[in-house]
Amino acid sequence: MVTQDLKKFSTPVFPFTAIVGQEEMKLALQLNVIDPKIGGVMIMGDRGTGKSTTIRAIADLLPEIEVVKDDPFNSHKSDLDLMGNEIKLAIQNGESLETELIKIPMVDLPLGATEDRVCGTIDIEKALTEGVKAFEPGLLAKANRGILYVDEVNLLDDHLVDILLDSAASGWNTVEREGISIRHPARFVLVGSGNPEEGELRPQLLDRFGMHAEIRTVKDPILRVKVVEERTSFDQTPMVWIENYEKQQQELRDRIVLAQKVLPTVELDYDLRVKISEVCSQLDVDGLRGDIVTNRAAKAHAAYHGRDKVTVEDIAKIITLCLRHRLRKDPLETIDSGNKVSKVFNEIFEIEE
């Protein structure tokens, strides 16, 4: 009863299915939710284009997850990669674990956050006097099995971005202080957003994001009017608005859950894998991250459409998102908008433009 009352008073979130346009950003977010191993998404675009609204909307859309009750790491009751050490010990000792359903964690990382706030801290005094590892979890612990959102990621300290990307890639966070070490699961979808006018990310950091979506302000006057009207209507009667979209929200929720189940069975033919690597090679992409992410994203896209085999159309839809930020570019150029990727893709896959 208390939980239901709290839901009534929680801040209403604009429905994901009601968002007009910005298909590239919406697709990238959905694919990362289907397969978090894609490695997150970097969203770059103009101010006021709905970046934050869309990211909060996808978190609100997702189904609840089962976690061990009162556990700071949102531990899974059976998956060893998603549980903290205390839960592992409890299972080894044969203790029964109480679980609860919670909404997917959506953690905002403020620009002024310190390393201790992000990673967590160890109480050295307690460790020395009482001999216990007293750990105060940080934002990475909170974000386990959820979404970690960094607005204006291009303005965040580089060493903090490094920490976030390392945790997102490995799924673990390690805190070392005064010879004491603590490790806990930190598997999350990392979503960064920013405005290119305020500065770019270093290429090494950009490369670590699985996908890169670019969004532009809507130019069509009729679409602009629609966006303004829908936002005004939502602000006036949010609960009515949310109820109107509940059916579409549930349909998309079911589709994402089904895609997550189908994903392990999706196949990508050897010939297509070779062609993906040919595209990466011809574009002179450094390293192999581009190949790996494109393979994963293509499988997630096929699963999203209910197929168990990747098609050329699946690859065509995602390859620009996966590669555009990995190209070597002239310092005077703005980041490649994807034309170069599309051109090489069409050549290698023999598609007429």
Swiss-Prot record:
InterPro entries noted in UniProt: AAA+_ATPase, CHLI-like, ChlI/MoxR_AAA_lid, Mg_chelatase_ATPase-isu, Mg_chelatse_chII-like_cat_dom, P-loop_NTPase
Domain of life where this protein originates: Eukaryota
Group of enzyme by EC: ligase
Function (record text): Involved in chlorophyll biosynthesis; introduces a magnesium ion into protoporphyrin IX to yield Mg-protoporphyrin IX.
Keyword presence, Transmembrane: no
Originating species: Trieres chinensis
NCBIfam families: BchI-ChlI
Main location: plastid
Pathway given in the UniProt record: Porphyrin-containing compound metabolism; chlorophyll biosynthesis
Chemical reaction(s) catalysed: protoporphyrin IX + Mg(2+) + ATP + H2O = Mg-protoporphyrin IX + ADP + phosphate + 3 H(+)
EC number: 6.6.1.1
Signal peptide residues on this chain, from the entry's feature table: none
Disulfide bond residue pairs: none
Binding site for ATP: G45, D46, R47, G48, T49, G50, K51, S52
Pfam families per the UniProt record, alphabetical: AAA_lid_2, Mg_chelatase
Family recorded in the similarity comment: Belongs to the Mg-chelatase subunits D/I family.
Gene: chlI
Record protein name field: Magnesium-chelatase subunit ChlI
A GO MF label: ATP binding
One record GO biological process: chlorophyll biosynthetic process
Compartments (UniProt record): Plastid, Chloroplast
Gene3D superfamilies to which the protein is assigned, alphabetical: Magnesium chelatase subunit I, C-Terminal domain, P-loop containing nucleotide triphosphate hydrolases
Gene Ontology CC terms: chloroplast
Keyword vocabulary terms for this entry: ATP-binding, Chlorophyll biosynthesis, Chloroplast, Ligase, Nucleotide-binding, Photosynthesis, Plastid
